[in-house]
Amino acid sequence: MNTLKSLLGAHLPKHAIILGSALGSVVDAVQDATDIPYAELSGFPIPKISGHAGKLVLGKIGGVEVAVLAGRAHAYESGNAAVMRPALEQLKDAGIEILILTNAAGSLKASMRPGSLMLLTDHINCAGMNPLIGQHGDENFVSMTNAYNADLRKAFLAAAKKEKIAVKQGVYCWYSGPSFETPAEIKMIQIIGGTAVGMSTAPETILARRLGLQVAAISTITNLAAGIKGASPSHEETKREGMKAAGDMKRLLTRFFKDIK
């Protein structure tokens, strides 16, 4: 098994991207790409669900060196909220400073339709677990203030404006899954301030902040949440709508990296 650092070669990325469900085609934006299957990387978890390729892609987006993780493992696959910890630790060890997370999410607002993009301003942990449980040391008492970096969010909003992509902002609620949320659960998280709901991202953000990485996160809205008129969430809908939104995600990421180059 290899470590990511040992395989970088001439690549020296400071930015990493984790792609959510059905967003695998975003790797088409990577120029001079080198693919490394997760199976060849020590500690990288192999995703067990469709819509997650399970490979690392090294190259450039918008002229900036990036490491793109095409797919993630979820807490519901093993019961381990820290399932992405080994991968994030290797990213940190390889020199990554900024982590951009993407995900598929259900909208808690009827006006935010499937196909929309939403920048995360914050999250609410509704999963009853935390990826830092069981780790020792005072450094695990991580501040989650500005967990989703405000400066990175401004840069993404500027990029979206240039590309004429309508991007919302909101609070992401993490449920463990794999079952979708009940209408009663959706009503509850609407009341407490949620904007979208999904099964990933929050534990990765907690781990990334523990490692000292700056984080930005973008949801692709793939369905209306349970209980909202017209909603009938399914994994097939998630994959279908995720693929539709991938084009806007590619344009947004490309413009973001061109602007920071």
Where in this protein do the model-derived segments appear?
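Active-site/ligand-binding-proximal alpha/beta "capping" segment
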Residues: 153, 158-195, 260
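His/Asp/Glu-rich mid-to-C-terminal helical/loop segments that flank catalytic regions of hydrolases
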Residues: 226-261
